[in-house]
């Protein structure tokens, strides 16, 4: 086996094993109502179809338009709350906006991006948020432990991917999509080591939803520093998910230590 490939596999296994050990320590808020969770399951399924190019754009948009009212009802009926930006939390525990890649948010490139292009999308309408991890083992070099990914907003988990390996062409690796009815936005957290939530979970700002990892087509390669890929899509009047640069929000909100 190629020596460099062997090292990459060892690092990925280290990230994954460390995350699994941490998982049992995290408390996740699960809905308690008996109301059907079909809308969450359906959105997760739709997202998978979009990723794999198995559904046409117009049909996918119509499905989203049908699912959103059901998701909102499920959210509020199961104790979901609206939170203003004053309650939002920086998405990496123990870090702040100084670790956002680029200069003044320059890593954000919306041109060419369309959610409905799935795994073949163009652009980079997101902020990459880096941890201190020079040896690429998914551990903070100073604290020698995993870094928790926190939900920036409140919302409901609508899609996740919890399985990934180096043979996959999935760019986001292990990811989470959260719908926040308050801001009418989808929030995307990608390249995670371990996903700690599931579709239909009701989330509040600052809750641990994952640990930072190196999963994804490019993110697992040694040349890529360990980071969270964080994106916000705002829904327009037709509920079309449009890229929104949340850099100003990221630099203004408080970090959780």
Could you tell me what each predicted segment is?
Residues 135-136, 163-166, 183-185, 194-196, ...:
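Solvent-exposed loop/turn segments at secondary-structure junctions
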Residues 4-13:
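Sec-dependent N-terminal signal peptides
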Residues 127-141, 185, 190-192, 232-241:
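Small beta-barrel nucleic-acid-binding modules, principally OB-folds
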Residues 169-178, 201-257:
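Conserved, short, structured surface segments that act as functional micro-motifs
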Residues 118, 138-141, 165-170, 219-224:
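Short consensus segments that form the blades of beta-propeller domains
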Residues 125, 143-146, 150-196, 226-227:
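Zn2+-dependent peptidoglycan hydrolase active-site motif and core
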Residues 15-148, 249-257:
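Polar/charged, compositionally biased leader and regulatory segments
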């Amino acid at each position: 086996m190629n020596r460099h490939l062997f090292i990459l596999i060892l690092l990925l296994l280290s990230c994954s094993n460390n995350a699994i050990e941490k998982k049992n320590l995290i408390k996740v808020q699960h809905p308690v109502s008996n109301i059907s969770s079909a809308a969450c399951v359906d959105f997760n399924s739709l997202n998978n179809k979009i990723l794999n190019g198995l559904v046409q754009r117009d049909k996918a948009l119509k499905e989203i338009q049908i699912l959103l009212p059901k998701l909102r009802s499920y959210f509020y009926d199961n104790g979901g709350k609206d939170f203003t930006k004053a309650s939002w939390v920086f998405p990496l525990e123990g870090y702040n906006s100084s670790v956002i890649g680029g200069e003044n948010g320059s890593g954000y490139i919306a041109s060419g991006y369309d959610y409905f292009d799935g795994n073949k999308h163009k652009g980079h309408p997101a902020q990459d948020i880096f941890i201190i991890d020079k040896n690429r083992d998914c551990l903070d070099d100073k604290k020698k432990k995993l870094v928790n990914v926190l939900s920036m907003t409140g919302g409901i988990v609508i899609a996740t991917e919890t399985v990934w390996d180096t043979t996959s062409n999935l760019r986001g690796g292990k990811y989470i999509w959260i719908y926040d009815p308050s801001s009418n936005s989808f929030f995307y957290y990608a390249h995670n080591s371990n996903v700690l939530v599931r579709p239909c979970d009701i989330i509040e700002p600052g809750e641990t939803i994952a640990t930072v990892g190196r999963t994804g087509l490019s993110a697992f390669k040694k040349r890529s520093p360990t980071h969270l890929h964080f994106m916000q899509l705002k829904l327009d009047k037709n509920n079309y998910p449009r890229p929104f640069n949340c850099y100003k929000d990221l630099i203004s909100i408080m970090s959780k230590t």
